[in-house]
Amino acid sequence: MKGGALHCRCSKCFAAPPKRRVKRRPRVLTLLSLPEDVLLYVLECLPAVDILSMREVHPHLRSLVDSHSSVWARASFQDVWPSPENLNLFERAAECGNFEACVKLGIAYLYNEGLSLSDDGRAEVNGLKASRFFSLTERLNSGADPFVWLFIRPPWSSSGSCCKAVVFDSLKEECGTVTSEEGATGALKGSIQYCLAKVLSLFEDDDKKREALGMLESSASHGCLHSSYLLWETKQKTALSDPGRYLQSFRQLRDYAARGCWDAQISLAKACGHKNQLSQEQRSASELVNQVFQSSLPINKTSIFTTQKGMNDTMRYILIDWLVEVATMKDFSSLCLHMTVGLVDRYLKLRSVPRAKLQLVGIACMVICTRFISKEILTIREAVWLTDNTYKYEDLVRMMGEIISALEGKIRMPTVVDYKDVLSHLIPLDRSTLHLCSYISELSLLYTELSTYSPAQLAAGALLLARILHKQARPWPAQLAETTGFTLEHLTPCVVLLHKKCFHDDAPKDYRQVSLTAVKQRFQDDLYDQISKEKVMDHSHLCELLGVPCRDSESPASCPNAADFHQFLCSPSGSKTKRRREDSIQEDRGSFVTTPTAELSNQEEDLLGDFLDWSLETSCSGYEGDRESEGEREGEVTAPSGVLDLSLLITEHQQCQDTTSDDDSLVPLHPIPLLSKLENGTHSTEGCAEKSSGYSSVSSGGSPTSSSSPPGLPFTPTPGLNHSKLMPIPFPQPCSPLFKASRRQVKRKNQAQHSEDNLSDEL
């Protein structure tokens, strides 16, 4: 470059240095970077224990947790039970409006489960605390019927102070101190008075019944719809005799139904079958009935297996089949059975349940439902005994709390039985057709594939199928089509599937190839005219009558592998027969738990007496009011608990198969059914397999408690039912395999003297 020469700064003469790009650091996003409302929602979805951990992470999180009560109101306490260690956590959540915490605290104090107190004044202290949390529960109960009364209903303990009575008196005193008659306080008073009236109505004392009627009137004046309906029921009998009163009563019922009372809607639908109403009233009622049927929605039960990873359709079938046997043995109504199954399915859709606790869920749901709709209940002590003490008293109490809290107190839901009863009032039905319809309705409980149809459709389909099978000239008359809104064309697919699942396809079998047919056995009773023994029309013939193509291809049997069966169901004794036990033991099970079925010899009695005395004393713990009726005394009951199972000493399955002789020396290896001594004659094992549902059942005669008749009255078994065949499904239980492997199943001789003609039915 020459000196003094100037150059322009164009791109040809001058190359500017390139600009350096400054790399921006990426923004670090953390949980605290979320908007406050989103962060609050995250905290509300956490379990209660994790909320405390999150609170210690950052001051901002601590501020959110402390300043927003909604975090505690929506905190989850799933699988967590109140204890001295977490009591403050539960109480804080309950005060903030957590429904689950209130329910569990109330039950924990009532049954003295988890929150141990000294025996001195325990009933009084626990009762007052349980009353406080039950009152909070009803305050938070917005969408369900008042239900806390089912925990304090009779029987009450007759020895000393009763915690249930303390809760009742405390709630009654609370209602007397309420001064505000409007708003939420008045509604709470109405709900509590309804619960108190329900409890009083279950006593036999006339004075208590009159007091219950007065409480219902007070509750109805505070706006409790359920109390208004119960008052309507009490006045209905007198209104039937006077046309003017009947019309006024009918209009009241229509008003309650329009306000959402389910029982009123069902009663209104049944009333449409009567011709006492004026034509205008009949028309409006028919429209409401049509709305009741059309508003019924299907419950997709197949989603259960999305939540329950280790469960399949056959496992559910086995559970429901066992519940049917329990309901038959205890003579529970079909409505109670349908409610129980519905409660089981709804809970299984919400909460994941280990396979070992499926039976616990089933029996806990039955305890809840019998308390809710039946005068005779299944006590907690008896429910534990029905599972052959596979679970403890406290296990059942806690499961009841889990179910009630998970379902938010919604126990009573529409069932197939409700709609079936309405249909039976709309048109005249002969006895056999009604029994066949009930039979089909209970069979529908076993199959999840039928849940694609609503309960109203299933009830209508069951009635239509029953009338077709009985060759009715007009199986679906115009009156039913108009009232329900279901035409024959709409119901045809449901009818075909009902027939295919209930009559065409084979029932699932256990690993011993024994069909599970508890519903069929239930309807072989003379009470149902042995309707299940009737020959049913072929599936192809039905399809031909309905004008639909016949698909004979049977759906793939949801039958698990043999290994799954061994884990899920042990070898039980069948109906009127002695079946061999499967002696192989799976590693994931402690042992097979079956109903004690053998008597001890004198020598065995002397050797094992001390152990059995200890086991009987320790197996029946918990709240006394659920263990004894008012007439029961200690020493009158022998429960089959803590039994030794020595038959598992032989673990080779081939050894059992080789012992096919009828020699008497083999009797100890194949114990006699518990109540065989109460049956007349002996039954051979040949030709009886098809009559069994696949369970060896506990007998109500040896039951420690029974709620099917009042104390002191002789127990009458269900007609036509072999009471030596019921037995719990032996789900795997957490027991020591080393101890169980050397146990043999025996039953201690009953010390209480009783005869076949007079078995005390104790609670």
Swiss-Prot record:
Motif Nuclear localization signal 1, chain ranges: 19-27
Disordered, as annotated region: 574-600, 677-763
Motif segment (D box 2): 355-358
Domain F-box: 28-75
Coiled coil: none
InterPro entries, sorted: Cyclin, Cyclin-like_dom, Cyclin-like_sf, Cyclin_C-dom, Cyclin_N, Cyclins_cyclin-box, F-box-like_dom_sf, F-box_dom
Stretches assigned to the Cyclin N-terminal domain: 299-411
Chain location of the short sequence motif Nuclear localization signal 2 per the record: 575-581
Any one Gene Ontology BP term: negative regulation of centrosome duplication
CDD domains assigned: CYCLIN_CCNF_rpt1, CYCLIN_CCNF_rpt2, F-box_FBXO1
Biased composition (Basic and acidic residues): 580-590
Keyword line: Cell cycle, Cell division, Cyclin, Cytoplasm, Cytoskeleton, Mitosis, Nucleus, Ubl conjugation pathway
Residue ranges with Basic residues bias: 741-751
Protein name in UniProt: Cyclin-F
This protein's encoding gene: ccnf
